[in-house]
Amino acid sequence: YVGEGLVASEQPVKQVILTSASSKTAYGAAHLLMKHKNERKLDYQVIGLTSANNKSFTQDLNCYDQVLSYDEIAELGEDKVNWILDFAGNKSLLLNLQNQFVNNIDKLILIGSTDVDAQQDKPHGHLESEFFFAPSQVKKRSGEWGHVGFSERYAKAWHSFAIHMNDKISVAEYSGAKAVEALYHTGLKNKLNNLEINVLKF
């Protein structure tokens, strides 16, 4: 979806900016954007925005060309055509980016809402954006490629990401309601281990 859009864009996109860059969905997308950029010979930078606490971790993933903390967004080139992929759901942040880039945001795609605290904040201002709904894309692509074709492409993308992340993160398993509940409360306190992918079993 994003890769094809970047190829088809009337204006060459120079920056693809991902918010909540330390989240697994974001850096998975970033990995594929880097891979597709090289395969399609496109000329954009994949830039991750994250909290200052997560900046070093996110840089070490090697999924981005550049990683900035949220208080460093002024360093982004204002005169470059941008796509913004939002995984945070922080409207204030998006309004700031929209104001900073003025007419140089070619597309703003709302994908996730990892910033739970920001959901309580309802700032005034209109976002020129569109929603990405994964089930709709799965249905669309399955119709175009067939179930087997979709599964093959999905497996290929996942395999590439898994190999890249193999020495960077580990899998942690939690079994039973109490363990799952404890992990949930750890998440609410924003103390989850970024170096782990959690597998929950009941």
Q: What do the predicted segments below correspond to?
A:
Residues 1-202:
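Terminal helix/beta-alpha structural elements that buttress the NAD(P)+-binding lobe
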